[in-house]
């Protein structure tokens, strides 16, 4: 459902952020 989709995004975003900041 939508909740699991949002959960996946919130787990995925922190992995992207370090590569963006560096």
Swiss-Prot record:
Its main location: secreted. It is found in: Secreted. The keyword tRNA processing does not apply. GO terms for cellular component: extracellular region. Expressed by the skin glands. GO terms for biological process: defense response to bacterium; defense response to fungus; killing of cells of another organism. Keywords: Antibiotic, Antimicrobial, Fungicide, Secreted. It comes from the Eukaryota. Belongs to the gastrin/cholecystokinin family. Has antibacterial and antifungal activity. This is Caerulein precursor fragment B3. It comes from Xenopus borealis (Kenyan clawed frog). The lineage of its organism: Eukaryota, Metazoa, Chordata, Craniata, Vertebrata.
């Amino acid at each position: 459902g939508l909740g699991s989709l949002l959960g996946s995004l919130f787990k995925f975003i922190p992995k992207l952020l370090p590569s963006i900041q560096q």
